[in-house]
Amino acid sequence: MSNTEAITIEAILARDNMCRAFAAVKRNKGAPGVDAKTIEQTAEHLRRHWVTIRDELLAGRYQPGAVRAVEIPKPQGGTRRLGIPNVQDRLIQQAMNQVLTAALDSSMSEHSYGFRPNRSAHDAVEAARRYVKQGKKWVVDIDLKQFFDQVNHDRLMSMLSRKIADKRVLALIGRYLRAPMRQANGQQQKRRRGTPQGGPLSPLLANLYLDPLDRELARRGIAFVRYADDVALFTSSERAARRQLDSVKGWLREQLDLDTNDEKSGTGRCGESQLLGFCIHETGDVSIAGKALLRLKERVREFWDARQSLTTRQLQAQWQRFVGGWWNYFSHANLQKDLHTLSGWIRRHMRKCFWQRWHDRAGRYNALRRLGVKGRGLKVAGCRRGAWAMSTHVVVNQALKTATLNRFGLTLPWVLAGRM
C-alpha cells in the first residue's frame, strides 16, 4: 500500500489511533473551545454519541465547530492570534495528524525541523552551527508575514490532493480550514485563508505548505534550516546573501502567495542574527540570544512580583516548572559567561519578593528567626529601606542563600548546571 492509499478516514478512526489521539489531547490539556466543554465533559459526550459522530465522519458529512479566537502576547512584541477548536475537534484533528504524519513525514525535507517526529529546535541550531563552521558565515533571515493567517487554502488543498486519495479526508481538512473564528464579542468571522495555530493539525499543514520552499532551496544548493515559519539561509558572502534574499522573497510571493516582513527579514553576519533564541558566532560557539535573555528577565520579574496573588507554594511549583523548562531548552548554549551573574540577579529578585511578602517588622523578624538569623542580625527587620535595596543586605543575603532556596525548591539555573 502506498503512502497516499494509507491515508483513509477508516485509518484515522481506527480504535487504536483514536485512543492514542485521546491520550495526546488529554496530556496536552488546553483550554475549552467555543462549546466550553472540558476534556472530561467531552469524554462523557463521546461515550454517548461517538457512534453517530463516527458515522458522520465515515459518510463525509461531519461539520466541525467554530474555533475560539484567543490573542496571546508575542515575545518580540505584539500579539499572535490562536484558534482554539472544541476538544472534540482537537481529538479528530489529532487522529488525522497521526495518520498523515506517519504517511507523509518521510517525504519531507531533511532541512525542516519544526513539529516533526524525532526533530527539534536543537537539531536546527546544530545544523546551522555546522554551516557556520564550514565557512557560511552570512545569514539570510526570512520572516514570513503573518504566515499562519495567510496560507492560501486553494493552493494548500491542491498540494494535499496530490498526497491524499481519500476524498472524505480532503473534504474534512477543507472544513477545518474554513471553520469560522468566534471572536470574544461573540461575532463569527469566516475564514478564506490561514491555518490558525491552536489545533493539532495546523503545524503539519504549515509544513506541507512550505515543503515546496524546502525543495526549491535544496534544488538551488542553498544551505538552510527551517523550523515551522522560521527560515534561515547560510552563504559565504554578503553579496550572495543579498541576492538570495531578493530571489527567495520573489519566489515566495509568486509560488506560495506569501509576503515577507521587510522589517524582520534581512542579511547579516552570523553573530548578528538569532535562530530560535540562540546566537551562533563565527567560531561556531552557541550562546543565548540577547532577546531571549531579555525575555527571561521579564519572566523573572513577573514571577517574583510581590503583588501576585499566588501563595508561596504555588510560586515554588510554577518556578520549578519554568526554570526546568528554560534550562532544558537553553542548556545547549555556552552559558559559562552569563550563567553565574544571571543566577545572582535572579536570586536578588527572589529575596526582594520574600522581603515584601513578610509585610512588616514583626513578619520580617519572625521569618528571619525561622531562617536562622540571631542576635543583632534581627534588627534588620526594622530597616526602612526599599525592598530592592534590602535584597542586597548581608543579613537577608545570608538568610536566603542558595542552599536555603534549593531546600525550598527554588532552584537556580547554575545549580542545575552543577555549579554550586
Task: Label each region the model flagged.
Residues 13, 64-70, 75, 177, ...:
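Core structural elements
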Residues 349, 354, 358-420:
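Extended C-terminal regions of large enzymes
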Residues 178, 253-326:
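A conserved non-catalytic segment of reverse transcriptases
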Residues 1-47:
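Non-catalytic, polymerase-adjacent accessory regions of viral genome-replication enzymes
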Residues 190-195, 285, 301-315, 325-338, ...:
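Short, solvent-exposed helix-loop connector elements
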Residues 88, 92-95, 129, 157:
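Duplex nucleic acid-engaging cores and interfaces of nucleic-acid transaction enzymes
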Residues 264-273, 319-322, 339-347, 362-371:
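A glycine-rich phosphate-binding loop feature that marks nucleotide/adenosyl-phosphate handling sites
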Residues 49, 56-71, 75, 110-272:
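Conserved polymerase palm-domain catalytic core
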